[in-house]
Amino acid sequence: MNLEQIYKDCGAYLQGHFLLSSGKHSEFYLQSAKVLEDPKLAGKLCDELAKIIASYDIKFDSICSPALGGILAGYELARACNKRFIFTERVEGVMNLRRGFEVKKGEKFIVCEDIITTGGSALESAKIIESLGGEVVGFAALANRGFCAVKNLNNPRKENAKLPENLPLFALGNFEFEIYEANVCPLCEKGTKAIKPGSRGN
């Protein structure tokens, strides 16, 4: 499966000057919503991701995603795995579990995102689950932006990765783009302004 080509065909592989949810800048941005707007394609991708997870014999009960970007990917993965799905969301900048969702003591979760960059939002969701007595046994994403180590792709972990080293991350593909601190961004030096295409409200 050529994930890069799928993103390009869907108009989801963007080039420009982007402000990421981390506050860093990049010349490229992956807009997974453009991929996931097609239910058949979303189902196909998450069916493939479910097969990868199953091949590692990971035992889990439910899937949780951080809103907003992870919801479609997480829901489709839950369908493919025949598991329960819940999501966390930010309230005044703080990740919470709302809407009557519950976590049972000892319930095992995979946290699913559309894109994992450093893994910050996924880690926030994992901490919520663990604080309520659940157990996170792994992470999943359609795509990894190259910082976190992916179990099935054998890519190395980089310095900025936030996901725990002892838990696996599964993804369909890796995208490695240069990411810059705002104060040393070569795109800013050329006089262009970073735009924020993402979903996190900050």
Curated annotation (Swiss-Prot):
Residues annotated for orotate binding in this entry: T117, R145
PROSITE patterns with a match to the protein in the record: PUR_PYR_PR_TRANSFER
Residues bound to 5-phospho-alpha-D-ribose 1-diphosphate: E113, D114, I115, I116, T117, T118, G119, G120, S121
Cofactor: Mg(2+)
Major enzyme class: transferase
Subunit comment: Homodimer.
Enzyme Commission number(s) from the entry: 2.4.2.10
Pfam families: Pribosyltran (PF00156)
Gene behind the chain: pyrE
Species of the source: Campylobacter lari (strain RM2100 / D67 / ATCC BAA-1060)
Catalytic activity: orotidine 5'-phosphate + diphosphate = orotate + 5-phospho-alpha-D-ribose 1-diphosphate
UniProt pathway annotation: Pyrimidine metabolism; UMP biosynthesis via de novo pathway; UMP from orotate: step 1/2
Name of the protein: Orotate phosphoribosyltransferase
